[in-house]
């Protein structure tokens, strides 16, 4: 809701990175029907599902580590849940690429799983698949974002239950390109 309320124009251009099945896409459109969204995901299956869930949105198969290939500029970028799968180096590149894709004054929304980066490890997801998950603290991001010229707008920590009944804390941040 906070991200949606940041835009004064009626039809801001929004890039969603790592859209998955399009749940965030659908939420954004429900809150701001004027959003002009281009949504990307590395998985063809996820893009097909997202298209079914959001027929009015422009979807593209694209790895979040390759967004520099996009030539359009955006008022906002949303990256709901890619950073847990990106190394520090890939996160830095993602932030740099996002900075270049944003118009002046544009906003970047992203989330990560809070924790000590050195404790990053393989985890089993809800589908039973194992993948490597990276943990981050807000301070892990702050220095890189400051260097690029982003200004912190919003930060919150939110607990989410895991499959094994434990909880993990997600960091949700919004920064603005100066």
Describe the role of every protein-language-model region:
Residues 1-11:
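Conserved alpha-helix/loop element of class I SAM-dependent methyltransferases that forms part
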């Amino acid at each position: 809701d906070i991200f949606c309320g940041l835009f004064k124009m009626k039809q801001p251009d929004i890039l969603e990175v790592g859209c998955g099945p399009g749940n965030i896409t659908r939420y954004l459109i429900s809150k701001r029907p004027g959003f002009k969204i281009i949504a990307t995901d590395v998985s063809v299956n996820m893009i097909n599902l997202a298209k079914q869930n959001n027929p009015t949105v422009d979807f593209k198969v694209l790895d979040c580590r390759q967004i520099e290939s996009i030539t359009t500029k955006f008022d906002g970028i949303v990256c709901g849940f890619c950073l847990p799968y990106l190394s520090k180096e890939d996160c830095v590149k993602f932030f740099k690429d996002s900075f270049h894709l944003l118009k002046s004054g544009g906003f970047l929304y992203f989330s990560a799983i809070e924790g000590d980066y050195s404790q990053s490890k393989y985890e089993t997801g809800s589908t039973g698949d194992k993948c490597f998950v990276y943990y981050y603290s807000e301070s892990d991001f702050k220095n890189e974002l400051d260097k690029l010229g982003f200004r912190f707008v919003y930060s919150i920590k939110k607990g989410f239950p895991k499959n094994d009944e434990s909880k993990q804390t997600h960091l949700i941040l919004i920064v603005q390109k100066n």
